[in-house]
Amino acid sequence: MSKAIKLPQKLMLLGSGELGKEFVIAAQRLGNYVIAVDRYANAPAMQVADFCEVISMLSADDLEAVVTKYQPDFIIPEIEAIRTEKLQEFEDRGITVIPTAAATNYTMNRDRIRELAHEELGIRTAKYGYAITLEELIAVSDEIGFPNVVKPVMSSSGKGQSVVATKEEVEKAWNYAIANSRGDSQKVIVEEFINFEIEITLLTIKQWDSPTIFCSPIGHRQERGDYQESWQPAGISEDKILEAQAIAKKVTDALGGAGIFGVEFFITKDEVIFSELSPRPHDTGMVTLISQNLNEFELHLRAILGLPIPKIEQLGPSASAVILASEKLDAPVFTGIAEALAAPDVDIRLFGKPTAHPYRRMGVALAKAENVQAAREKATDAASKIQISSQ
C-alpha cells in the first residue's frame, strides 16, 4: 500500500462495541467516513459513526447488501462472529480487509490460530485438545489432566471460559462454553492449565511498508475469562520481552496484512508461552488511552492507512479497571462519576451500551500514578465508585 494514501477513506467496521467506538473516534479525527455495523441497534460505535447498519454478520446476504450499498475502501472486523468466507470475496473484488481476509479467518477461531502457532510455526503453547460433544470433552480433559481450561473455539472477549479443577466440573464447563459460543460453532478447546506468574498482552503493530513495532507489554488480570484490570508497563524482564516480540512477529508475519494485533502470553518463571491472538485492538489495551502518546486505536488506524508511526511513548505507570453491571437493566444510569474523577490523573470512559446485564462491561476507569501498584489501586477505586441503576 502506498504511503501517499489520500484522505478521507471509507471504513466499514464489522462489530461496533466499545473498542470499535474508540477506533471510530480516531478515524474521524483524520476526517474519514465510518460505517458501523452490528447485530443490535445503538451499539457504542454506532453512536459516533457517520452511518450505521443492523445486520446479521453471519449472513452472507446481509454482508453483501451493506458492502454493495456503501462500497467501502476498507473492511475492519472488530468481532469474531462474522461469515469470514464472504470477506475473501470482498478482498478478491479489491476491498482491503484488515488485516487480510485469510488472517481474519484464521483468528476468528481459537483452533485455527493455535494450530498455526504450534503445529506450523513450532511455537510453545499449552497442551490442548478439542471436543464437539460432552463425552469427547470428558475424554480430552482426562488426557490433558486437571486442572485445565475449557473455552469455546469462537467467543467474544473471553466469554465462556472456565477453569476445570475436577472431572465432576466438566459438564458445567461444557454447558457454559456452548452457551457463550459465537457463530455456528459447537466446538470447545481444552487447554493445559499454565501456572503463570503474569499474563500479558503484547500489542504488535504490523505495517504495510515499515517494520513491525511493539508497545510496552501490558499485564492483565482475568475473571470468568474476561479482563478485569490491565496495567502498563507489565514489569517483566527485557529478555522475556524480546522473546515475546520474536514470537509475536513470527505469528503476525505468517498472517500478513497490516494493523494492530493483541498477542497474549503466559509468562512463567522460565518460559514465554503463546496463548491467543486477536487481529484488532485488544480490550486489555484500553489502558493505552492514558498510558501512551498514541493509543492502540490510533496505532491501528495509522497502520491500516499506511501512515507513519515515528514514536510510541509510554507515559509512565498506568492502569485500567472495568466498570461492570450487576443486574439486567434497560437504559442504565450512572452515578458516582464526580467521586470517581476527584482524584488526579484519573479518567473514565462510559461506553454507552443501551442495556446492561450481570458482568457486562459498561465502562472503564483509567489512572496514572508513581508506580504500577498505585495506578492499579487508583483505577480500581475509581471504578468502584461508579454505580449503575435504572432510571
From Swiss-Prot:
Source organism, top-level taxon: Bacteria
Gene Ontology molecular function terms on file: ATP binding; magnesium ion binding; phosphoribosylglycinamide formyltransferase 2 activity; phosphoribosylglycinamide formyltransferase activity
EC assignment: 6.3.1.21
Keyword Endoplasmic reticulum tagged: no
Pfam families tied to this protein: ATP-grasp (PF02222), PurT_C (PF21244), RS_preATP-grasp-like (PF22660)
Pathway field: Purine metabolism; IMP biosynthesis via de novo pathway; N(2)-formyl-N(1)-(5-phospho-D-ribosyl)glycinamide from N(1)-(5-phospho-D-ribosyl)glycinamide (formate route): step 1/1
InterPro entries reported in the protein's UniProt record: ATP-grasp, ATP-grasp_carboxylate-amine, ATP_grasp_subdomain_1, PreATP-grasp_dom_sf, PurT, PurT/PurK_preATP-grasp, PurT_C, Rudment_hybrid_motif
Annotated binding of N(1)-(5-phospho-beta-D-ribosyl)glycinamide, by residue: 18-19, 78, 283, 353, 360-361
Keyword entries, A-Z: ATP-binding, Ligase, Magnesium, Metal-binding, Nucleotide-binding, Purine biosynthesis
GO biological process assignments: 'de novo' IMP biosynthetic process
Catalytic activities: N(1)-(5-phospho-beta-D-ribosyl)glycinamide + formate + ATP = N(2)-formyl-N(1)-(5-phospho-beta-D-ribosyl)glycinamide + ADP + phosphate + H(+)
PROSITE patterns: ATP_GRASP (PS50975)
GO cellular component: cytosol
SUPFAM superfamilies referenced in this protein's UniProt entry, alphabetically: Glutathione synthetase ATP-binding domain-like (SSF56059), PreATP-grasp domain (SSF52440), Rudiment single hybrid motif (SSF51246)
Residues binding ATP: 110, 151, 156-161, 191-194, 199
Positions that bind Mg(2+): 264, 276
HAMAP family the UniProt entry points to: PurT
Family of this protein: Belongs to the PurK/PurT family.
NCBIfam families according to UniProt: PRK09288.1, purT
Subunit structure: Homodimer.
PANTHER family: FORMATE-DEPENDENT PHOSPHORIBOSYLGLYCINAMIDE FORMYLTRANSFERASE
Protein name: Formate-dependent phosphoribosylglycinamide formyltransferase
Organism for this UniProt entry: Trichormus variabilis (strain ATCC 29413 / PCC 7937) (Anabaena variabilis)
Primary gene name: purT
